[in-house]
């Protein structure tokens, strides 16, 4: 007598289909499962020691055809034809090139037409596909979950394990449904959604979970919007974030360089259509957010969970009942040099950064151009616009976006991680305040002493024009 398959979540389906060896034992004593990895993304920062480990053990890369590398974290976004000035950054980039050549790994170096941030390059090449497992030595690998992939950031020792075996020992995760019910109001983006989610559940609320984003608002999002949302799952403490594949997914993937072709495409779509959470499947936790109540969101503190609607005021720690939360807020406000009760819209900025693996895609740049068209960046404000890849830059140029950016007084750069993190020349100086479309606002994240407010691309552009945290609606009001 055959057993009846229990209803499963999307994450469970992908996990089960990739188990090479099932771990034994129960509870805390349970051994990890051995999971097969379909795609391994590599960059210059977390890979050098992993390759050294292969050499010491006399091993080769098991599946170089399932491994792809790109230079992104340390690369400059101007003068890319010149040697990298910082010796540590230069060494890491040169080491990646040598390692990829030695081990037969495909690399997209600076200046290459496909170079860019690893989490932008993978999807645009069609390498990220539904139902696959994706890993990278980078926290924001969760980006790829927008395609219905199980995508996780891993450490350097795990990078070595995947290079050597194309597998990874992992313990099963819990699952959490994030339901965004209803449609988003005009002017509200997926960046606002994920900031609101993190503010609701906290930076540790997703710890040990794979988040599945569901609901009408998610179904109505573009693939690039879904990538933004999944990208920041890690900021809620989650291991991964996922969205079930649908017609929007297939339309994005079709005809990408590495997407299946012809009959293989038809077979793939038929398989991908099964990647839905079954009716009756049980999540370990569920969260509901009414999309109609959301407005543009912005962070005020030093972690992504310290955020409020743009129309709100800087919170008062004295009104926070939880002592730990209150102490964290006091510390954050001291670092950010903010006074409780200050309207968020009255906070001035020195710098605006548009880019990163969160918001460096073509739709993000179009949103910025829509705001900047026939407007100027405010006096005293520096605006950097950095495409997530050279392909994104080329597309933006073909649409005339670069001309709009230049006319507004913004700096239009080459591809790279740029000001998302202080590992390349694009950094804040101590005390500078930045409205940033990136994913982390930790102390010193964008440069020692720099202060970061996380925002959507549209809010970033409006902020650049007004010189204070603003939405496009604020600019429209100022014209009347």
Swiss-Prot record:
Q: What class of enzyme is it?
A: lyase
Q: Does the keyword Lyase apply?
A: yes
Q: Name one GO molecular function term.
A: 4 iron, 4 sulfur cluster binding
**Per its UniProt record, what Pfam families does this chain match?**
Aconitase (PF00330)
Q: Which residues bind [4Fe-4S] cluster?
A: 357, 417, 420
Q: Where is this region: Disordered?
A: 431-454
Q: Which cysteines are joined by disulfide bonds?
A: none
A GO BP entry: L-leucine biosynthetic process
Specify the pathway: Amino-acid biosynthesis; L-leucine biosynthesis; L-leucine from 3-methyl-2-oxobutanoate: step 2/4
- EC identifiers of the protein: 4.2.1.33
Q: Where is the composition biased (Polar residues)?
A: 431-441
Catalytic reaction list: (2R,3S)-3-isopropylmalate = (2S)-2-isopropylmalate
* PANTHER family reported in the protein's UniProt record: 3-ISOPROPYLMALATE DEHYDRATASE, HOMOACONITASE, MITOCHONDRIAL-RELATED
Q: How does it assemble?
A: Heterodimer of LeuC and LeuD.
Q: What is this protein called?
A: 3-isopropylmalate dehydratase large subunit
Q: What is the lineage of its organism?
A: Bacteria, Bacillati, Actinomycetota, Actinomycetes, Mycobacteriales
């Amino acid at each position: 007598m055959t057993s009846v398959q229990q209803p499963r979540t999307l994450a469970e389906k992908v996990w089960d289909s990739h188990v090479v060896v099932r771990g034994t034992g129960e509870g805390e004593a349970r051994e990890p499962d051995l999971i097969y990895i379909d795609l391994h993304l590599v960059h210059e920062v977390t890979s050098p020691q992993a390759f050294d480990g292969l050499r010491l053990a006399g091993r080769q890369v098991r599946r170089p055809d399932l491994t792809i590398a790109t230079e992104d974290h340390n690369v400059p976004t101007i003068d890319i034809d010149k040697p990298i000035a910082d010796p540590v950054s230069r060494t890491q980039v040169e080491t990646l090139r040598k390692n990829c050549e030695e081990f037969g790994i495909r690399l997209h170096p600076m200046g290459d037409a496909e170079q860019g941030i690893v989490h932008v390059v993978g999807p645009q090449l069609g390498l990220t596909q539904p139902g696959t497992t994706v890993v990278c030595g980078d926290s924001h690998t969760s980006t790829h979950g927008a395609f219905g992939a199980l995508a996780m950031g891993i450490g350097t020792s795990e990078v070595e394990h995947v290079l050597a075996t194309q597998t990874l020992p992992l313990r099963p995760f819990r699952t959490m449904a994030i339901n965004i019910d209803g449609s988003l109001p005009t002017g509200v983006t997926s960046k606002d959604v994920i900031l609101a989610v993190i503010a609701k559940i906290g930076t540790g609320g997703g710890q040990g979970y794979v988040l599945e984003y569901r609901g009408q608002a998610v179904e109505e999002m573009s693939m690039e919007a879904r990538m933004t949302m999944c990208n920041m799952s890690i900021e809620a403490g989650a291991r991964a974030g996922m969205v079930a594949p649908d017609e929007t997914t297939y339309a994005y993937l079709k005809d990408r360089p590495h997407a299946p072709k012809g009959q293989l495409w038809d077979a793939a779509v038929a398989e991908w259509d099964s990647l839905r959470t079954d009716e009756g499947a049980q999540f370990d936790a569920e969260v509901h957010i009414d999309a109609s109540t959301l407005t543009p969101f912005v962070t005020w503190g030093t972690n992504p969970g310290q955020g409020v609607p743009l129309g709100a005021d800087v919170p008062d720690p004295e009104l926070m009942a939880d002592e730990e939360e209150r102490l964290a807020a006091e510390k954050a406000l001291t670092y950010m040099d903010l006074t409780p009760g200050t309207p968020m819209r009255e906070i001035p900025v020195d710098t605006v950064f548009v880019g990163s693996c969160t918001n460096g895609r073509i739709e993000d740049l179009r949103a910025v151009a829509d705001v900047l068209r026939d407007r100027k960046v405010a006096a005293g404000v520096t605006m950097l616009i950095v495409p997530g890849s050279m392909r994104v830059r080329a597309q933006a140029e073909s649409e005339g976006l670069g001309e709009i950016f230049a006319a507004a007084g913004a700096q239009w750069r080459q591809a790279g991680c740029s000001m998302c993190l202080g590992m390349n020349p694009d950094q804040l100086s101590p005390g500078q305040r930045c409205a940033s479309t990136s994913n982390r606002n930790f102390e010193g994240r964008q440069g020692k002493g720099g202060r970061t407010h996380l925002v959507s691309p549209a809010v970033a552009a409006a902020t650049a024009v007004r010189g204070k945290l603003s939405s496009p609606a604020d600019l429209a009001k100022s014209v009347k």
